[in-house]
Amino acid sequence: MSNYFDTLNLREQLDQLGRCRFMDREEFSTEADYLKGKRVVIVGCGAQGLNQGLNMRDSGLNVAYALRQAAIDEQRQSFKNASENGFEVASYEKLIPQADLVINLTPDKQHTNVVETVMPLMKEGATLGYSHGFNIVEEGMKIRKDLTVVMVAPKCPGTEVREEYKRGFGVPTLIAVHPENDPKGEGWDIAKAWAAGTGGHRAGCLESSFVAEVKSDLMGEQTILCGMLQAGSIVCYEKMIADGIDASYAGKLLQFGWETVTEALKFGGVTHMMDRLSNPAKIKAFDLSEELKDLMRPLYNKHMDDIISGHFSSTMMADWANDDVNLLGWREETGETAFENYPDSSLEIPEQEYFDNGILMVAMVRAGVELAFEAMTASGIVDESAYYESLHELPLIANTVARKRLYEMNVVISDTAEYGNYLFANVATPLLREKFMPLVDTDVIGRGLGAISNQVDNAKLIEVNETIRNHPVEYIGEELRGYMTDMKTIAVGG
């Protein structure tokens, strides 16, 4: 197999990268009806598999789970997830031939083997579904020409897919149809019905492409979503400990601080997050973030270049073939970092203190969001995709750090995201440690600016505010958050 993206000419590549349209709620007026009366079989029952299946069943769809016979015989966790929730569970051979829609929700590294196994069992004219297009775009999987291939990609971990559905809402979702596999012209009808079955239409769906989803998803998760949180946690903790700050306080400020500052980001973008700081702290955070952007821009651009060229994917797949020796080694090293092992305590930090004493964290978030967004849009990815894969998902990932530090983040994200995270953090951590952290003090991480005057230069403050608010990520963010608010009003009202 060869990388699908590389088989496209430049015009086709740019067209696929630039596919992203926010879909009107009226386009989902029939909700999941197109799939009602049809047989949906999900392969794999991890977080995405189970929670998408629960939502689809509650939306009136007929859902079953196909697992390997060994997983059934040994009653592995995937079998327990499905059977304990009352789903029919059976082997590939029993369920796949009956399926109208087969949804592959196994880990990325298993996709080739799974698809090569299930494809001969699928009936003529059936549909194969993905929630991440890596297998199609990066591995170049060729699908039988009579099969339709679609994607529904919720922009959050599987647990949130379920929780938002139970609240009567959903999560923003990218949907796509593989242009090489839509023989009956029904791909979009199937994708829309599947998305509606998960509740995604209530939060807003983006009409995208397999290429745009994969390239933007890889970039976001490697850099701002995971890599920057990991590198930032490690170097900020080291700084505070070296300067005499209590280990429990330093660890808690970081573990729960990322979640707190990005919660502000979720509601009002970078502008609102920065507005949570005092005026002197805002100017300080702005200056720090500008320095960080200058320092880290080459690294962000390298990751984007390696994703576009396919170098990242080929490197990771080589590690798959080598029994994940690099991935597992980096995972172990992360578990041994000082931040991961800081002592627990009953200490409580007031919400505003996370901002006041975490000025550098705010600066890192602003720098990381803007750098990731800029790298993506400069490569042909449109603003909407870049927003969802940078700013929008960051609070969701920060929440996993709050639960169980970096370990939880790396468990919840895919192996693909985890591998990319380590690639980024392994370079970003020493870069920050050597070139940036010696230039800052605990007034920006750990202790705060203290009892200083709030007086600032008015012209400087105006310049800072205008620069923050006029970044393209703020314009598209305000527009998309507005759509989501409107969608939620309609969903709740309905």
From Swiss-Prot:
Name of the gene this protein is made from: ilvC
Any one Pfam family match given in the protein's UniProt record, by short name: KARI_N
Protein name: Ketol-acid reductoisomerase (NADP(+))
Binding site for Mg(2+) 2: D217, E389, E393
Organism: Aliivibrio salmonicida (strain LFI1238) (Vibrio salmonicida (strain LFI1238))
Reaction catalysis annotation: (2R)-2,3-dihydroxy-3-methylbutanoate + NADP(+) = (2S)-2-acetolactate + NADPH + H(+); (2R,3R)-2,3-dihydroxy-3-methylpentanoate + NADP(+) = (S)-2-ethyl-2-hydroxy-3-oxobutanoate + NADPH + H(+)
Keyword vocabulary terms for this entry: Amino-acid biosynthesis, Branched-chain amino acid biosynthesis, Magnesium, Metal-binding, NADP, Oxidoreductase, Repeat
Function recorded in the entry: Involved in the biosynthesis of branched-chain amino acids (BCAA). Catalyzes an alkyl-migration followed by a ketol-acid reduction of (S)-2-acetolactate (S2AL) to yield (R)-2,3-dihydroxy-isovalerate. In the isomerase reaction, S2AL is rearranged via a Mg-dependent methyl migration to produce 3-hydroxy-3-methyl-2-ketobutyrate (HMKB). In the reductase reaction, this 2-ketoacid undergoes a metal-dependent reduction by NADPH to yield (R)-2,3-dihydroxy-isovalerate.
Span of domain KARI C-terminal knotted: 209-344, 345-487
